[in-house]
Amino acid sequence: MSMSNMSGGSCAATRLTWWLESWCESNDPNFTAKAADVVGLYVAPPAKAIVLCVDEKPSIQALERAQGYLKLPNGRALTGQSHDYKRHGTTTLFAALEVATGKIIATHSKRRRRVEFLDFMNSVTATFPNRKLHVILDNLNTHKKNEDWLKAHPNVQFHFTPTSASWLNQVEVWFSILQGQSLSGTSFTSLKQLQEHIDAYVNAYNDRAEPFVWTKKKVRQRRFKGRRITQL
């Protein structure tokens, strides 16, 4: 017997009963200035400069899942994956999205410490020699307090999103595309196979890459009140 039958309500009412709304609220006192700085780089980038969105996608798991099908009573076959899986390790993907072209620079790492972040930034700067680089980042601790590296790279300027507002970073959109188009529902027999799979996707994506177009007219700091309904 379903819960809707037990409670005497409709399926829609039962779903609403267990509905949980969630969000991440930014309490950054400098939200407006930081958001304007980031959005300004999207809609009016400095002349002859490169704007990059940089972040990492940590702990991408190489999971090996059994593939197969289940024959249903009506004769149809239901294909899918087993709930069980075998772990083959994880990789952290560092990525830089070039705002003007939509193209991706990506590399794999075992960890995501400051040293790995700066190693990636060294490879990014080498890709654009003698160019002014504006790099959009979130507020991860490894992204902050890199004054010595910035002094050694005077052509690079970091721009930080407001706290709890990493959605302003366009590379987060690309990570979502990567997950939906390339990683969801996959199975890998080794960490190397996962990394090669991601690399092949990045290459194919860059062949057809187009820049994201910023269309939101206003970015405002929102204040929410929590609501949770659990009563039957």
Predicted features, each with a name:
Residues 112-113, 135-146, 163-168, 193:
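Acidic, metal-coordinating catalytic cores used for nucleic-acid/nucleotide bond scission
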Residues 104, 171-190, 206:
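Active-site proximal helix-loop segment of RNase H-like, two-metal nucleases, encompassing DDE(D)
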Residues 35-118, 219-231:
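Extended, low-complexity cationic-aromatic segments
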